[in-house]
Swiss-Prot record:
One of its GO terms (molecular function) is fatty acyl-CoA hydrolase activity. Transmembrane segments: none annotated. Belongs to the acyl coenzyme A hydrolase family. This is Acyl-coenzyme A thioesterase 4, mitochondrial. The gene is TE4. Its EC number is 3.1.2.-.
Length: 527
Protein backbone atom coordinates (compact mmCIF):
# COMPACT_ATOMS: atom_id res chain seq x y z
CA UNK A 1 0.00 0.00 0.00
CA UNK A 2 1.22 3.47 -0.82
CA UNK A 3 1.04 6.10 1.88
CA UNK A 4 -0.29 9.61 1.25
CA UNK A 5 2.39 12.23 0.73
CA UNK A 6 2.43 16.01 0.76
CA UNK A 7 0.85 18.75 2.82
CA UNK A 8 -2.09 21.08 2.34
CA UNK A 9 -1.66 24.02 -0.03
CA UNK A 10 -2.69 27.33 1.48
CA UNK A 11 -1.90 29.87 -1.23
CA UNK A 12 -3.53 30.65 -4.55
CA UNK A 13 -1.59 30.82 -7.83
CA UNK A 14 -1.40 34.35 -9.27
CA UNK A 15 -2.25 34.85 -12.91
CA UNK A 16 1.24 36.29 -13.50
CA UNK A 17 2.98 33.04 -12.57
CA UNK A 18 6.44 33.17 -14.20
CA UNK A 19 7.74 30.43 -16.46
CA UNK A 20 11.08 30.32 -14.59
CA UNK A 21 9.24 29.59 -11.35
CA UNK A 22 7.30 26.82 -13.06
CA UNK A 23 10.54 25.26 -14.32
CA UNK A 24 11.96 25.38 -10.80
CA UNK A 25 8.78 23.76 -9.55
CA UNK A 26 9.02 21.00 -12.16
CA UNK A 27 12.62 20.23 -11.21
CA UNK A 28 11.36 19.20 -7.75
CA UNK A 29 8.39 17.25 -9.04
CA UNK A 30 8.33 13.58 -9.95
CA UNK A 31 4.89 12.55 -11.22
CA UNK A 32 3.15 9.62 -9.62
CA UNK A 33 1.22 7.28 -11.93
CA UNK A 34 -2.31 6.41 -10.97
CA UNK A 35 -4.96 3.90 -11.96
CA UNK A 36 -8.75 4.13 -12.26
CA UNK A 37 -10.69 3.61 -9.08
CA UNK A 38 -11.57 0.08 -8.11
CA UNK A 39 -15.11 -1.10 -7.49
CA UNK A 40 -14.01 -2.14 -4.01
CA UNK A 41 -13.54 0.76 -1.67
CA UNK A 42 -11.31 -1.34 0.60
CA UNK A 43 -8.55 -1.43 -2.02
CA UNK A 44 -8.31 2.30 -2.53
CA UNK A 45 -6.53 5.05 -0.72
CA UNK A 46 -5.90 8.75 -1.15
CA UNK A 47 -2.76 9.77 -3.00
CA UNK A 48 -2.76 13.57 -3.15
CA UNK A 49 0.54 14.78 -4.58
CA UNK A 50 1.17 18.29 -3.30
CA UNK A 51 4.03 20.71 -2.71
CA UNK A 52 5.51 22.02 0.51
CA UNK A 53 5.16 25.76 0.80
CA UNK A 54 8.90 25.98 1.32
CA UNK A 55 9.43 24.52 -2.13
CA UNK A 56 7.08 26.80 -4.02
CA UNK A 57 4.93 29.67 -2.89
CA UNK A 58 2.70 29.49 -5.96
CA UNK A 59 1.45 25.93 -6.35
CA UNK A 60 -0.57 24.87 -9.36
CA UNK A 61 -3.55 22.57 -9.22
CA UNK A 62 -5.08 20.75 -12.17
CA UNK A 63 -8.02 18.52 -12.93
CA UNK A 64 -7.74 14.98 -11.65
CA UNK A 65 -9.81 12.16 -13.09
CA UNK A 66 -11.77 10.11 -10.60
CA UNK A 67 -13.56 7.13 -12.13
CA UNK A 68 -16.36 5.43 -10.24
CA UNK A 69 -19.54 3.49 -10.90
CA UNK A 70 -23.07 4.99 -10.84
CA UNK A 71 -25.05 6.22 -9.01
CA UNK A 72 -23.40 9.63 -9.50
CA UNK A 73 -21.86 11.23 -6.46
CA UNK A 74 -20.59 14.74 -6.10
CA UNK A 75 -16.85 15.09 -5.74
CA UNK A 76 -14.77 16.93 -3.19
CA UNK A 77 -11.35 18.36 -3.80
CA UNK A 78 -9.48 15.20 -2.78
CA UNK A 79 -10.58 11.77 -3.98
CA UNK A 80 -9.31 8.23 -3.72
CA UNK A 81 -7.33 6.42 -6.37
CA UNK A 82 -6.78 2.72 -6.70
CA UNK A 83 -3.21 1.58 -6.03
CA UNK A 84 -3.82 -2.07 -6.77
CA UNK A 85 -2.91 -2.90 -10.41
CA UNK A 86 -5.20 -5.91 -10.34
CA UNK A 87 -8.17 -3.68 -9.60
CA UNK A 88 -8.13 -1.97 -12.98
CA UNK A 89 -11.65 -1.83 -14.34
CA UNK A 90 -13.31 -0.42 -17.42
CA UNK A 91 -13.79 3.34 -16.99
CA UNK A 92 -16.89 4.30 -15.14
CA UNK A 93 -19.81 6.27 -16.40
CA UNK A 94 -19.03 9.56 -14.71
CA UNK A 95 -15.57 11.09 -14.39
CA UNK A 96 -16.11 14.15 -12.17
CA UNK A 97 -14.40 17.40 -12.99
CA UNK A 98 -12.57 19.77 -10.69
CA UNK A 99 -11.32 23.25 -11.38
CA UNK A 100 -7.83 23.87 -12.71
CA UNK A 101 -6.73 26.86 -10.65
CA UNK A 102 -7.24 27.22 -6.90
CA UNK A 103 -9.48 30.00 -5.67
CA UNK A 104 -10.43 31.41 -2.32
CA UNK A 105 -13.23 28.82 -2.32
CA UNK A 106 -10.75 25.95 -2.71
CA UNK A 107 -8.44 25.16 0.18
CA UNK A 108 -6.32 22.69 -1.77
CA UNK A 109 -6.14 20.68 -4.95
CA UNK A 110 -4.29 17.43 -5.67
CA UNK A 111 -1.69 17.59 -8.43
CA UNK A 112 -1.04 14.60 -10.63
CA UNK A 113 0.74 14.28 -13.95
CA UNK A 114 -1.37 11.36 -15.12
CA UNK A 115 1.69 9.52 -16.39
CA UNK A 116 5.00 8.19 -15.17
CA UNK A 117 6.63 10.25 -17.93
CA UNK A 118 7.26 13.86 -16.90
CA UNK A 119 5.23 16.28 -19.02
CA UNK A 120 6.28 19.82 -19.94
CA UNK A 121 4.09 22.52 -18.48
CA UNK A 122 2.58 23.21 -21.92
CA UNK A 123 1.11 19.70 -21.94
CA UNK A 124 -0.32 19.72 -18.45
CA UNK A 125 -4.05 19.10 -18.78
CA UNK A 126 -6.02 22.16 -17.79
CA UNK A 127 -3.53 24.63 -19.20
CA UNK A 128 -5.07 24.86 -22.66
CA UNK A 129 -8.28 22.82 -22.59
CA UNK A 130 -11.27 22.79 -20.28
CA UNK A 131 -11.20 20.63 -17.12
CA UNK A 132 -13.91 18.43 -18.63
CA UNK A 133 -12.01 17.79 -21.84
CA UNK A 134 -8.88 16.83 -19.94
CA UNK A 135 -10.80 14.59 -17.56
CA UNK A 136 -12.25 12.73 -20.53
CA UNK A 137 -8.92 12.43 -22.32
CA UNK A 138 -7.30 11.02 -19.21
CA UNK A 139 -10.17 8.53 -18.91
CA UNK A 140 -9.34 7.36 -22.43
CA UNK A 141 -5.64 7.18 -21.55
CA UNK A 142 -6.54 4.89 -18.66
CA UNK A 143 -8.31 2.58 -21.10
CA UNK A 144 -5.08 2.34 -23.12
CA UNK A 145 -3.06 1.69 -19.96
CA UNK A 146 -5.43 -1.06 -18.85
CA UNK A 147 -4.74 -3.23 -21.89
CA UNK A 148 -1.09 -2.28 -22.22
CA UNK A 149 0.87 -1.75 -25.39
CA UNK A 150 -0.26 -3.82 -28.42
CA UNK A 151 2.14 -6.22 -30.09
CA UNK A 152 4.29 -5.06 -33.00
CA UNK A 153 1.73 -6.20 -35.55
CA UNK A 154 -1.54 -6.93 -33.70
CA UNK A 155 -4.42 -8.57 -35.54
CA UNK A 156 -7.43 -6.66 -36.74
CA UNK A 157 -10.52 -6.59 -34.57
CA UNK A 158 -12.02 -9.54 -36.41
CA UNK A 159 -14.28 -10.84 -33.65
CA UNK A 160 -16.86 -8.12 -33.15
CA UNK A 161 -19.20 -8.00 -30.20
CA UNK A 162 -22.69 -6.58 -29.82
CA UNK A 163 -23.13 -4.03 -27.06
CA UNK A 164 -26.10 -2.27 -25.55
CA UNK A 165 -26.32 1.54 -25.45
CA UNK A 166 -26.06 1.34 -21.66
CA UNK A 167 -22.52 -0.04 -21.94
CA UNK A 168 -21.31 3.20 -23.53
CA UNK A 169 -23.45 5.59 -21.47
CA UNK A 170 -21.29 8.22 -19.80
CA UNK A 171 -22.08 11.37 -17.86
CA UNK A 172 -20.16 14.41 -16.69
CA UNK A 173 -21.18 16.58 -13.74
CA UNK A 174 -20.25 20.28 -13.50
CA UNK A 175 -20.41 21.56 -9.93
CA UNK A 176 -20.93 25.13 -11.08
CA UNK A 177 -22.93 26.12 -8.01
CA UNK A 178 -20.09 25.38 -5.58
CA UNK A 179 -16.84 25.50 -7.59
CA UNK A 180 -15.83 29.13 -8.13
CA UNK A 181 -12.85 28.42 -10.38
CA UNK A 182 -14.80 25.97 -12.53
CA UNK A 183 -17.44 28.65 -13.13
CA UNK A 184 -14.74 31.05 -14.28
CA UNK A 185 -13.70 28.56 -16.97
CA UNK A 186 -17.17 28.75 -18.51
CA UNK A 187 -18.26 32.32 -17.80
CA UNK A 188 -18.45 34.78 -20.71
CA UNK A 189 -18.24 38.60 -20.36
CA UNK A 190 -22.04 38.81 -20.03
CA UNK A 191 -22.21 36.38 -17.10
CA UNK A 192 -23.58 33.56 -19.23
CA UNK A 193 -22.20 30.17 -20.25
CA UNK A 194 -19.52 30.05 -22.95
CA UNK A 195 -21.19 28.00 -25.66
CA UNK A 196 -17.86 27.44 -27.41
CA UNK A 197 -16.40 25.77 -24.31
CA UNK A 198 -19.50 23.62 -24.00
CA UNK A 199 -19.21 22.49 -27.64
CA UNK A 200 -15.59 21.58 -26.96
CA UNK A 201 -16.65 19.38 -24.06
CA UNK A 202 -19.46 17.79 -26.07
CA UNK A 203 -16.99 16.69 -28.74
CA UNK A 204 -14.61 15.29 -26.12
CA UNK A 205 -17.40 13.34 -24.41
CA UNK A 206 -18.70 11.99 -27.73
CA UNK A 207 -15.19 10.77 -28.54
CA UNK A 208 -14.89 9.00 -25.19
CA UNK A 209 -18.26 7.30 -25.69
CA UNK A 210 -17.24 6.19 -29.20
CA UNK A 211 -14.01 4.79 -27.82
CA UNK A 212 -15.81 2.85 -25.07
CA UNK A 213 -18.18 1.31 -27.61
CA UNK A 214 -15.40 0.22 -29.98
CA UNK A 215 -13.04 -1.15 -27.34
CA UNK A 216 -12.97 -4.88 -26.70
CA UNK A 217 -11.41 -6.42 -23.63
CA UNK A 218 -9.28 -8.91 -25.58
CA UNK A 219 -6.15 -6.76 -25.33
CA UNK A 220 -5.12 -7.78 -28.85
CA UNK A 221 -7.30 -5.61 -31.05
CA UNK A 222 -5.59 -2.94 -33.08
CA UNK A 223 -6.56 0.51 -31.72
CA UNK A 224 -8.97 2.34 -34.00
CA UNK A 225 -8.71 5.93 -35.10
CA UNK A 226 -12.10 7.48 -34.27
CA UNK A 227 -12.83 10.86 -35.84
CA UNK A 228 -15.80 13.22 -35.82
CA UNK A 229 -17.45 13.15 -39.25
CA UNK A 230 -20.31 15.58 -38.64
CA UNK A 231 -22.56 17.16 -36.05
CA UNK A 232 -26.29 17.41 -36.69
CA UNK A 233 -28.44 20.32 -35.65
CA UNK A 234 -28.37 21.06 -31.93
CA UNK A 235 -30.94 23.52 -30.63
CA UNK A 236 -30.60 25.42 -27.37
CA UNK A 237 -34.02 24.74 -25.83
CA UNK A 238 -33.55 27.07 -22.87
CA UNK A 239 -30.82 29.35 -21.52
CA UNK A 240 -28.04 27.66 -19.53
CA UNK A 241 -27.26 29.27 -16.18
CA UNK A 242 -23.64 29.72 -15.13
CA UNK A 243 -24.50 29.38 -11.41
CA UNK A 244 -26.46 26.10 -11.49
CA UNK A 245 -25.04 22.57 -11.58
CA UNK A 246 -24.93 21.09 -15.07
CA UNK A 247 -24.53 17.57 -16.44
CA UNK A 248 -23.98 16.03 -19.86
CA UNK A 249 -25.19 12.48 -20.51
CA UNK A 250 -24.61 10.52 -23.70
CA UNK A 251 -24.53 7.07 -25.31
CA UNK A 252 -24.20 5.39 -28.69
CA UNK A 253 -27.66 5.27 -30.29
CA UNK A 254 -26.97 3.84 -33.76
CA UNK A 255 -24.18 1.88 -35.48
CA UNK A 256 -23.50 1.24 -39.16
CA UNK A 257 -20.61 -0.67 -40.67
CA UNK A 258 -17.84 1.78 -39.74
CA UNK A 259 -19.82 4.72 -38.40
CA UNK A 260 -21.87 5.41 -35.31
CA UNK A 261 -24.14 8.13 -33.97
CA UNK A 262 -23.85 9.37 -30.41
CA UNK A 263 -26.56 11.43 -28.74
CA UNK A 264 -25.67 13.81 -25.92
CA UNK A 265 -28.03 15.70 -23.64
CA UNK A 266 -27.10 18.79 -21.65
CA UNK A 267 -29.19 18.78 -18.48
CA UNK A 268 -29.74 21.55 -15.96
CA UNK A 269 -32.49 21.21 -13.37
CA UNK A 270 -34.40 24.29 -12.29
CA UNK A 271 -36.43 24.88 -9.15
CA UNK A 272 -39.40 26.04 -11.21
CA UNK A 273 -40.21 22.58 -12.61
CA UNK A 274 -39.95 19.00 -11.37
CA UNK A 275 -40.56 17.48 -14.83
CA UNK A 276 -37.33 15.70 -15.96
CA UNK A 277 -37.97 16.70 -19.58
CA UNK A 278 -37.78 20.37 -18.57
CA UNK A 279 -34.16 19.89 -17.51
CA UNK A 280 -32.97 19.21 -21.08
CA UNK A 281 -31.22 22.35 -22.33
CA UNK A 282 -29.62 20.97 -25.49
CA UNK A 283 -29.53 17.74 -27.52
CA UNK A 284 -26.62 16.97 -29.86
CA UNK A 285 -26.05 14.12 -32.34
CA UNK A 286 -22.43 13.42 -33.30
CA UNK A 287 -21.44 11.06 -36.11
CA UNK A 288 -18.08 9.31 -35.72
CA UNK A 289 -16.29 7.12 -38.24
CA UNK A 290 -13.67 4.47 -37.48
CA UNK A 291 -10.40 4.03 -39.34
CA UNK A 292 -7.76 1.36 -38.88
CA UNK A 293 -4.90 3.12 -37.11
CA UNK A 294 -2.31 1.29 -39.23
CA UNK A 295 -3.84 1.18 -42.72
CA UNK A 296 -6.04 4.28 -42.52
CA UNK A 297 -8.92 2.38 -44.15
CA UNK A 298 -12.46 2.18 -42.76
CA UNK A 299 -12.78 -0.35 -39.97
CA UNK A 300 -15.77 -2.46 -39.00
CA UNK A 301 -16.94 -1.68 -35.46
CA UNK A 302 -18.99 -3.37 -32.75
CA UNK A 303 -22.72 -3.48 -33.38
CA UNK A 304 -25.42 -2.22 -31.05
CA UNK A 305 -28.50 -3.94 -29.63
CA UNK A 306 -31.12 -1.53 -28.23
CA UNK A 307 -32.93 -3.07 -25.27
CA UNK A 308 -35.40 -0.61 -23.78
CA UNK A 309 -38.26 1.10 -25.60
CA UNK A 310 -36.46 4.44 -25.45
CA UNK A 311 -33.25 2.95 -26.87
CA UNK A 312 -35.18 1.39 -29.76
CA UNK A 313 -36.88 4.71 -30.50
CA UNK A 314 -33.54 6.54 -30.52
CA UNK A 315 -32.12 3.87 -32.85
CA UNK A 316 -34.99 4.33 -35.34
CA UNK A 317 -34.63 8.12 -35.26
CA UNK A 318 -30.87 7.89 -35.81
CA UNK A 319 -31.36 5.41 -38.65
CA UNK A 320 -33.75 7.83 -40.36
CA UNK A 321 -31.23 10.66 -39.99
CA UNK A 322 -28.51 8.49 -41.50
CA UNK A 323 -30.69 7.65 -44.51
CA UNK A 324 -31.59 11.32 -44.90
CA UNK A 325 -27.93 12.38 -44.93
CA UNK A 326 -27.13 9.89 -47.68
CA UNK A 327 -30.18 10.83 -49.69
CA UNK A 328 -29.28 14.54 -49.56
CA UNK A 329 -25.76 13.81 -50.77
CA UNK A 330 -27.16 11.74 -53.63
CA UNK A 331 -29.74 14.23 -54.91
CA UNK A 332 -27.84 17.52 -54.39
CA UNK A 333 -26.48 17.62 -57.96
CA UNK A 334 -29.86 16.69 -59.43
CA UNK A 335 -31.51 19.55 -57.55
CA UNK A 336 -29.14 22.09 -59.07
CA UNK A 337 -30.34 21.15 -62.56
CA UNK A 338 -34.02 21.66 -61.86
CA UNK A 339 -35.79 24.65 -63.39
CA UNK A 340 -37.27 25.67 -60.04
CA UNK A 341 -33.79 25.79 -58.52
CA UNK A 342 -32.57 28.13 -61.28
CA UNK A 343 -35.54 30.42 -60.71
CA UNK A 344 -34.83 30.61 -56.98
CA UNK A 345 -31.19 31.35 -57.74
CA UNK A 346 -32.09 34.26 -60.00
CA UNK A 347 -34.57 35.63 -57.47
CA UNK A 348 -31.86 35.72 -54.81
CA UNK A 349 -29.45 37.46 -57.19
CA UNK A 350 -31.93 40.13 -58.34
CA UNK A 351 -31.40 42.49 -55.41
CA UNK A 352 -27.68 41.78 -55.35
CA UNK A 353 -27.40 42.99 -58.94
CA UNK A 354 -29.06 46.26 -57.91
CA UNK A 355 -26.36 46.74 -55.25
CA UNK A 356 -23.65 46.12 -57.82
CA UNK A 357 -25.11 48.08 -60.76
CA UNK A 358 -27.25 50.76 -59.07
CA UNK A 359 -25.85 51.14 -55.53
CA UNK A 360 -27.54 54.53 -54.96
CA UNK A 361 -30.95 52.90 -55.50
CA UNK A 362 -30.34 49.76 -53.41
CA UNK A 363 -32.53 48.95 -50.43
CA UNK A 364 -31.12 50.68 -47.34
CA UNK A 365 -32.42 47.87 -45.13
CA UNK A 366 -30.33 45.30 -47.00
CA UNK A 367 -26.61 44.58 -47.11
CA UNK A 368 -24.37 42.49 -49.36
CA UNK A 369 -23.15 39.20 -47.94
CA UNK A 370 -19.52 40.12 -48.58
CA UNK A 371 -19.87 43.16 -46.29
CA UNK A 372 -20.71 40.96 -43.29
CA UNK A 373 -17.52 38.86 -43.43
CA UNK A 374 -14.89 38.42 -40.73
CA UNK A 375 -11.75 36.27 -40.71
CA UNK A 376 -9.38 34.67 -38.21
CA UNK A 377 -5.96 33.23 -39.03
CA UNK A 378 -3.69 31.26 -36.73
CA UNK A 379 -1.08 28.52 -36.62
CA UNK A 380 -2.30 25.30 -34.97
CA UNK A 381 -0.11 24.70 -31.94
CA UNK A 382 0.87 21.42 -30.22
CA UNK A 383 -1.12 22.41 -27.14
CA UNK A 384 -4.34 22.17 -29.21
CA UNK A 385 -3.91 18.56 -30.28
CA UNK A 386 -6.04 15.61 -29.20
CA UNK A 387 -4.90 12.20 -27.99
CA UNK A 388 -4.28 11.15 -31.61
CA UNK A 389 -1.84 14.01 -32.18
CA UNK A 390 -4.11 16.03 -34.47
CA UNK A 391 -5.95 19.26 -33.75
CA UNK A 392 -8.91 18.64 -31.44
CA UNK A 393 -12.25 19.00 -33.24
CA UNK A 394 -13.82 20.57 -30.17
CA UNK A 395 -11.20 23.33 -30.27
CA UNK A 396 -12.13 24.04 -33.90
CA UNK A 397 -15.83 24.19 -33.00
CA UNK A 398 -15.11 26.60 -30.16
CA UNK A 399 -13.08 28.92 -32.37
CA UNK A 400 -15.77 28.75 -35.06
CA UNK A 401 -18.69 29.59 -32.78
CA UNK A 402 -16.74 32.45 -31.20
CA UNK A 403 -15.98 33.89 -34.64
CA UNK A 404 -19.64 33.42 -35.60
CA UNK A 405 -20.70 35.35 -32.50
CA UNK A 406 -18.29 38.17 -33.37
CA UNK A 407 -19.75 38.25 -36.88
CA UNK A 408 -23.32 38.62 -35.62
CA UNK A 409 -22.23 41.15 -32.98
CA UNK A 410 -20.66 43.43 -35.58
CA UNK A 411 -23.56 42.82 -37.99
CA UNK A 412 -26.44 43.54 -35.59
CA UNK A 413 -24.72 46.15 -33.47
CA UNK A 414 -25.86 44.48 -30.22
CA UNK A 415 -24.87 41.39 -28.27
CA UNK A 416 -26.58 38.40 -29.89
CA UNK A 417 -27.44 35.11 -28.24
CA UNK A 418 -26.76 31.61 -29.53
CA UNK A 419 -29.75 29.52 -30.63
CA UNK A 420 -28.47 26.46 -32.47
CA UNK A 421 -25.72 24.67 -34.32
CA UNK A 422 -27.30 23.94 -37.68
CA UNK A 423 -24.65 21.55 -38.96
CA UNK A 424 -20.91 20.84 -38.79
CA UNK A 425 -18.88 18.97 -41.42
CA UNK A 426 -15.39 17.62 -40.71
CA UNK A 427 -14.03 17.16 -44.23
CA UNK A 428 -10.35 16.57 -43.50
CA UNK A 429 -8.11 16.44 -40.42
CA UNK A 430 -6.17 19.46 -39.22
CA UNK A 431 -2.58 18.85 -38.12
CA UNK A 432 -0.21 20.59 -35.74
CA UNK A 433 1.56 23.39 -37.59
CA UNK A 434 -1.22 23.92 -40.13
CA UNK A 435 -1.97 27.52 -41.08
CA UNK A 436 -5.72 27.67 -40.48
CA UNK A 437 -7.97 30.45 -41.75
CA UNK A 438 -11.54 30.74 -40.46
CA UNK A 439 -13.79 32.81 -42.72
CA UNK A 440 -17.27 33.76 -41.57
CA UNK A 441 -20.22 35.62 -43.04
CA UNK A 442 -23.93 36.09 -42.47
CA UNK A 443 -25.54 33.83 -45.09
CA UNK A 444 -29.07 35.11 -44.67
CA UNK A 445 -31.49 36.48 -42.10
CA UNK A 446 -35.03 35.36 -41.28
CA UNK A 447 -37.22 38.35 -40.50
CA UNK A 448 -40.69 36.77 -40.60
CA UNK A 449 -40.99 37.03 -36.81
CA UNK A 450 -40.22 40.68 -36.01
CA UNK A 451 -39.83 39.95 -32.29
CA UNK A 452 -37.10 37.35 -32.86
CA UNK A 453 -35.12 37.89 -36.07
CA UNK A 454 -32.75 35.01 -36.89
CA UNK A 455 -29.19 35.45 -38.15
CA UNK A 456 -27.70 32.45 -39.99
CA UNK A 457 -23.90 32.35 -40.06
CA UNK A 458 -21.48 30.23 -42.06
CA UNK A 459 -17.90 29.61 -40.91
CA UNK A 460 -15.51 27.83 -43.28
CA UNK A 461 -12.09 26.62 -42.14
CA UNK A 462 -9.28 26.51 -44.72
CA UNK A 463 -5.96 24.72 -44.25
CA UNK A 464 -3.56 26.96 -46.14
CA UNK A 465 -0.07 25.91 -47.26
CA UNK A 466 1.79 28.95 -48.61
CA UNK A 467 4.87 26.93 -49.62
CA UNK A 468 2.65 24.73 -51.82
CA UNK A 469 0.34 27.57 -52.89
CA UNK A 470 -2.66 25.48 -51.81
CA UNK A 471 -5.77 25.97 -49.69
CA UNK A 472 -8.21 23.20 -48.74
CA UNK A 473 -11.49 23.36 -46.86
CA UNK A 474 -11.24 21.30 -43.66
CA UNK A 475 -14.49 22.20 -41.89
CA UNK A 476 -17.83 23.89 -42.46
CA UNK A 477 -19.88 25.22 -39.56
CA UNK A 478 -23.38 26.68 -39.57
CA UNK A 479 -24.88 28.55 -36.60
CA UNK A 480 -28.04 30.50 -35.83
CA UNK A 481 -28.15 33.52 -33.50
CA UNK A 482 -30.83 36.00 -32.52
CA UNK A 483 -31.13 39.34 -30.74
CA UNK A 484 -32.95 39.97 -27.51
CA UNK A 485 -36.55 41.25 -27.50
CA UNK A 486 -35.41 44.35 -25.60
CA UNK A 487 -33.24 45.43 -28.52
CA UNK A 488 -36.14 44.92 -30.94
CA UNK A 489 -38.42 46.99 -28.71
CA UNK A 490 -35.81 49.75 -28.70
CA UNK A 491 -36.07 49.94 -32.48
CA UNK A 492 -33.21 47.70 -33.60
CA UNK A 493 -33.54 46.79 -37.28
CA UNK A 494 -31.84 43.60 -38.46
CA UNK A 495 -30.98 44.03 -42.12
CA UNK A 496 -31.68 41.61 -44.95
CA UNK A 497 -28.56 39.94 -46.39
CA UNK A 498 -28.34 39.43 -50.16
CA UNK A 499 -25.81 37.53 -52.29
CA UNK A 500 -23.99 39.29 -55.11
CA UNK A 501 -22.59 36.29 -56.99
CA UNK A 502 -23.97 32.98 -58.18
CA UNK A 503 -21.60 31.11 -55.88
CA UNK A 504 -22.93 33.02 -52.86
CA UNK A 505 -26.53 32.39 -53.92
CA UNK A 506 -25.85 28.65 -54.24
CA UNK A 507 -24.45 28.57 -50.70
CA UNK A 508 -27.61 30.25 -49.41
CA UNK A 509 -29.91 27.82 -51.23
CA UNK A 510 -27.89 24.82 -50.11
CA UNK A 511 -28.25 25.90 -46.49
CA UNK A 512 -31.96 26.65 -46.85
CA UNK A 513 -32.59 23.27 -48.49
CA UNK A 514 -30.67 21.52 -45.72
CA UNK A 515 -33.21 22.91 -43.26
CA UNK A 516 -36.12 21.57 -45.35
CA UNK A 517 -36.96 17.86 -44.93
CA UNK A 518 -37.03 15.78 -48.12
CA UNK A 519 -39.07 12.65 -48.89
CA UNK A 520 -37.56 9.36 -47.75
CA UNK A 521 -35.13 7.65 -50.07
CA UNK A 522 -34.34 4.00 -50.67
CA UNK A 523 -30.66 4.83 -50.86
CA UNK A 524 -29.33 2.91 -47.87
CA UNK A 525 -25.68 2.08 -48.55
CA UNK A 526 -23.45 2.09 -45.50
CA UNK A 527 -20.82 4.73 -44.94
Amino acid sequence: MMTPIGIRIRKQIPLSYHYSSIQALLSRFTPTPYNPISNSSSSTQTIPTQFHESQCTNPISRPTVFLFDPPPIRFTHTKSFSTDPSSLDFPSNQPPVVSTISSHHNISQPIDAGSSIRKPISLWPGMFNSPVTNALWEARSNMFEKYGEPTADPPSQSELVTKSPAQSRTSILYNLSSDYALREHYRNPWNMIRIGKLLEDLDALAGTIAFKHCTNEDGMSRPLLLVTASVDKMVLKKPISIDTDLSIVGAVTWVGRSSMEIQLQVLQTTHESSDPSDSVSLVANFTFVARDSKTGKSAVINQISPETGEEKLLWREADERNKMRKMKRKIQKDLELEKQYIERLNALLAEGRVFCDLPALADRNSILMKDTCLENSFICQPQQRNIYGRIFGGFLMRRAVELAFSTTYSFAGVVTHFLEVDHVDFLRPVDVGDFLRLKSCVLYTELQNPTEPLINVEVVAHVTRPELRSSEVSNKFYFTFSVGPEAVKDGLLVRNVVPATEEEARRVLERMDAETPHPHSQYENEI
